[in-house]
Amino acid sequence: MYKIAFDVMGSDLGSLTAIKAASEFIKEHDDLYLVLVGDETEIKQALQQTPIDKTKYEIFPTTQVIDMNGSILDIRRKKDASIIRTLELVRDQKVDGMLTGGNSAAFIGAAHFILGELNNIVRAGFMPTMPNAKNKLTLLLDVGANSENTPEDLVNYAKMANIYYKEVLKNPNASIGLLNIGTEKSKGLELQKQTFKQLEELKNINFIGNVESRDVLTGNVDIIVTDGYSGNICLKACEGAAKVLLTEIKKEITSSFIKKLASLVLKKSFKNVAAKFDYKNHAGAILLGVKGICFKSHGSSDVRSFKATLRMTLDAIKNDIVKKIEKGLIENEY
């Protein structure tokens, strides 16, 4: 039985949305047990509306929440915050992994202090899975855990992501690109130039050189490494572009009776494309580099987004990904 701690507090839509996602997800997985972390009264009220089999969950009560407007200093001030207790469950090996939709800065800071980083990792990075045109997934990191990074950080991200792609996504020869403003080797700031040089020297990864933001959704590269500042901008630009494009297509094909009639022929195709590039189906990001399986969902996550993050968390647990990454970093097998 796999056990996941779910911080159901702190996200924009409240605990009811998180618990509804938990209720739906656990019905699909007989091998899963959930620890719902948060305000006990609030959780019990939500469970009355969206019940879960009592043999498949327990409540871990907390008295505090670090909301989206909270300070990173709250990780010291609010010792009984749900996000703190959830990470402590991972540290104490009471659960196999965790997820939260709460405050990102608090999550990153608390994970650093409570769990610590793996061997030679100075800064952990957020890594989401991005859908692409080739019906595969592109890994992009860091997407905002850090505002500044070193070349060594980016090289470590490439190593860890390569292990993740091999073990979880089952591709032993993933291509790795460095996000830059052009594909030429001479492009970029000193960070990109030094990172390029170090990645080029690694013999056991498939480094293909510099790539651009437009390559994220094409499927021409499997893993893209970048600093957290650029990565966050890239991620949100891709999510926004996909959302606007799908909205405009829907608006256009429903703008007249004739277009509506014609669109019926392609309705299934439109739905397939919309589902492929809907970020809510890939809403989670793992905090890669800490000593535990820790996932962050969007603060604005709805039921579908939380279920997607639960699925990613369970996949990472089943593949024992943190131990494999730790072993790979120590033995230089990535």
From Swiss-Prot:
Pathway: Lipid metabolism; phospholipid metabolism. GO terms for biological process: fatty acid biosynthetic process; phospholipid biosynthetic process. It catalyses: a fatty acyl-[ACP] + phosphate = an acyl phosphate + holo-[ACP]. GO terms for molecular function: phosphate:acyl-[acyl carrier protein] acyltransferase activity. Its EC number is 2.3.1.274. Keywords: Cytoplasm, Lipid biosynthesis, Lipid metabolism, Phospholipid biosynthesis, Phospholipid metabolism, Transferase. Signal peptide: none annotated. Transmembrane segments: none annotated. Pfam families: FA_synthesis. GO terms for cellular component: cytoplasm. It is found in: Cytoplasm. Homodimer. Probably interacts with PlsY. PANTHER family: FATTY ACID/PHOSPHOLIPID SYNTHESIS PROTEIN PLSX, PHOSPHATE ACYLTRANSFERASE. Belongs to the PlsX family. Catalyzes the reversible formation of acyl-phosphate (acyl-PO(4)) from acyl-[acyl-carrier-protein] (acyl-ACP). This enzyme utilizes acyl-ACP as fatty acyl donor, but not acyl-CoA. HAMAP family: PlsX. This is Phosphate acyltransferase. The lineage of its organism: Bacteria, Bacillati, Mycoplasmatota, Mollicutes, Mycoplasmataceae.
